[in-house]
Amino acid sequence: MRRLSMALAATAMTIGVGVGVATPVQAAPADKPQVLSGWTQTSAASYNAWWSARQNQGNWAAYNFDWSTDYCSGSPDNPLGFPFQNSCARHDFGYRNYKAAGTFAANKARLDSALYEDLKRVCAPYGAVARATCNSTAWTYYQAVKILG
């Protein structure tokens, strides 16, 4: 009887393990396109919502967003000391996730405009001379992504 109990227990454990392996991967929530859109608009509120989510990525794991970034790619992340890195990270987020969704072409212009607006917000607190230099640099970055992607 003891052997039978042990055999049944071993079988139950094997079946339990097998069931765990066969669990299907869950699809992303149906509102993923709306969430992505909300985080990639040109407004400061959109940027702030994305920034908050980026700081709490675990809360958004079910959406399978691509949070990876190379920041400003081949360009400096902080040109002339202006901190463009996080704006570039949001731009990467938009590019990578819209490409994965297959809707990049329809959203590229807005994503590039959002980068430019983000960069101008980085520049806004500087004094007149530094702000002009920063805005000029922001314009150059915007033109580069607009043309080169």
What are these regions, as identified by a protein language model?
Residues 9-18:
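Bacterial N-terminal signal peptides
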